[in-house]
Amino acid sequence: MKKDTGFDSKIEKLARTTASKTGRRGFIGRLGGFLVGSALLPLLPVDRRSRLGGEVQAATTGNLTRSGFKPQDKDPKACEYWRHCTIDGNLCDCCGGTLTSCPPGSSLSPSSWVASCYNPGDQQTYLIAYRDCCGKQTCGRCNCVNTQGELPVYRPEFNNDIVWCFGADNDAMTYHCTISPIVGKAS
């Protein structure tokens, strides 16, 4: 039999050398670690400032919270009202509702997302449970995009980019506006 010195013999020699120096368990362990790491990759935090508009994007440069947010306790229809520190949507105050109730013709979603907001009036921090009002067309007035304390989608209870209308009465999946009731003191 003639000795082959070509490509096949080099690959065979490499395979035999690798097999003699490494174990199957080590390979399977590394492969398992790679697969688990690949599966966990989507759970890493994501910087989503690039999808925001120009002025909003410029306001968030260098920080994930909105730069210059000064909470006030005078006008509940303003985006800077202290309860709206992490709201992303239309204020129900401007759409026929109140801070704690939906406008007529819309229904309250059973789901909520939470945030802690600072009230400059009494210098306390409160837990706010934002809830969407659903079932009517989007109000379109008093639209606020506040991202203070918002976390990526893998922590949905602290994310304000999700439309929380699933589970609303009568399959009312259309977002209308958002209320911001106080749950209690945060500290």
From Swiss-Prot:
There is a cross-link at residues 113-164 (Tryptophan tryptophylquinone (Trp-Trp)). Disulfide bonds join 79-144, 85-117, 92-177, 94-142, 102-133, 134-165. Residues 1-57 form the signal peptide. It catalyses: 2 oxidized [amicyanin] + methylamine + H2O = 2 reduced [amicyanin] + formaldehyde + NH4(+) + 2 H(+). It is found in: Periplasm. Uses a protein-derived tryptophan tryptophylquinone (TTQ) cofactor. One of its GO terms (biological process) is amine metabolic process. Pfam families: Me-amine-dh_L. The modification Tryptophylquinone is found at residue 113. This is Methylamine dehydrogenase light chain. Its EC number is 1.4.9.1. GO terms for molecular function: aliphatic amine dehydrogenase activity; methylamine dehydrogenase (amicyanin) activity. It comes from the Bacteria. It comes from Methylophilus methylotrophus (Bacterium W3A1). Predicted to be exported by the Tat system. The position of the signal peptide cleavage has not been experimentally proven. Tryptophan tryptophylquinone (TTQ) is formed by oxidation of the indole ring of a tryptophan to form tryptophylquinone followed by covalent cross-linking with another tryptophan residue. Belongs to the aromatic amine dehydrogenase light chain family. Transmembrane segments: none annotated. One of its GO terms (cellular component) is outer membrane-bounded periplasmic space. Heterotetramer of two light and two heavy chains. It is an enzyme of class 1 (oxidoreductase).
